[in-house]
Amino acid sequence: MNFNKLFAIVLLAALVLLGQTEAGGLKKFGKKLEGVGKRVFKASEKALPVAVGIKALGK
């Protein structure tokens, strides 16, 4: 008996049966990650002009 083929068939069957579930938990995680990205982007928008100004003064 070839274990690799059996494992591949079982894995494929599990993906087909379990792949149709809702993405509730994953969606929540994605929303949190998106919020973190927005906060980092806004903070960098505020800090970047200050950093550029300090760099210009240092020349």
Swiss-Prot record:
Any one annotated GO CC term: extracellular space
Any Pfam family hit: Cecropin
UniProt main location, coarse: secreted
Subcellular location: Secreted
Signal peptide bounds: 1-23
Methyltransferase keyword on record: no
Family matches, as InterPro entries: Cecropin, Cecropin_insect
Chain segments annotated as transmembrane: none
Keywords: Antibiotic, Antimicrobial, Immunity, Innate immunity, Secreted, Signal
Keyword Ligase listed: no
GO BP annotation list: antibacterial humoral response; defense response to Gram-negative bacterium; defense response to Gram-positive bacterium; innate immune response
Family the entry assigns: Belongs to the cecropin family.
Job of this protein: Cecropins have lytic and antibacterial activity against several Gram-positive and Gram-negative bacteria.
Protein name: Cecropin-A2
Organism: Aedes albopictus (Asian tiger mosquito)
Lineage: Eukaryota, Metazoa, Ecdysozoa, Arthropoda, Hexapoda
